[in-house]
Design a protein with these regions (language model features):
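Gly/Ser/Thr-rich loops at beta-strand to alpha-helix junctions
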Residues: 9-14, 40-42, 144-152
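A structured beta-alpha segment of the ubiquitous adenosine-cofactor-binding alpha/beta core
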Residues: 54-78, 84-87, 105-115, 119-122, ...
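N-terminal Rossmann-like dinucleotide-binding module
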Residues: 4-33
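Short helix-capping segments at alpha-helix termini
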Residues: 26-28, 53-60, 160
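Residues at the starts of beta-strands that form the adenosine-phosphate
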Residues: 3, 32, 62, 164
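NAD(P)-binding Rossmann-fold cofactor-contacting core
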Residues: 27-51
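A short, gly/pro- and small-residue-rich
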Residues: 92-109
Length: 164
């Protein structure tokens, strides 16, 4: 049985869709799914949604939810990261500040000045997560779904080239 840790599991759409897709693979149907988020309310919503997917699909998978990142990561075989490092209200400034200075931003969280703003806020959090991965599940495969994806993946590769 594989253990898959979802860090930032409160991202309802991503988590629900990824779990649903993951469970279509026979080798993953008995997985232990460890949901982790710092927002207790959102974590509760996602836990109920994932429990429903498991129940309705009659999968033998197990699901836990925690606000403790170490608990979720311990002995994980895979780590899926879908975090938002700051409240969504902060994200608005990534669009409005460049706009005020007439800097065109075609995609507000992946490229241009806006993407750099978000990357600078998110990199320290991502690197902390990867430090924990190295400590608690060093053989895990890490899948990042957090934007700006390319900047964050590059930072992780430079800091931790041995993480998969």
């Amino acid at each position: 049985m594989a253990k898959v840790a979802f860090i930032g599991a409160g991202s309802f759409g991503f988590t629900r869709g990824l779990v649903r897709d993951m469970l279509t693979y026979p080798t993953m149907q008995d997985a232990h799914i460890a949901l982790m988020d710092i927002d207790k309310e959102r974590l509760g919503y996602v836990k109920r949604a994932v429990d429903r997917i498991v129940h309705e699909g009659s999968y033998p998978a197990t699901v836990t939810a925690t606000q403790n990142r170490v608990e979720a990561l311990r002995d994980a075989d895979a780590v899926i990261i879908t975090i938002l490092a700051q409240p969504i209200e902060v994200w608005r400034h990534d669009i409005e500040i460049p706009k005020r200075f007439k800097v065109d931003t075609n995609v507000g969280d992946t490229r241009s000045v806006s993407g750099v703003f978000r990357a600078l806020r998110t990199m320290p959090v991502m690197l902390d997560i990867i430090r924990d991965v190295k400590r608690y599940c060093p053989r895990a495969i890490v899948l990042n779904y957090t934007n700006p994806m390319s900047m964050l993946c590059r930072a992780m590769q430079r800091q931790f080239p041995d993480v998969q």
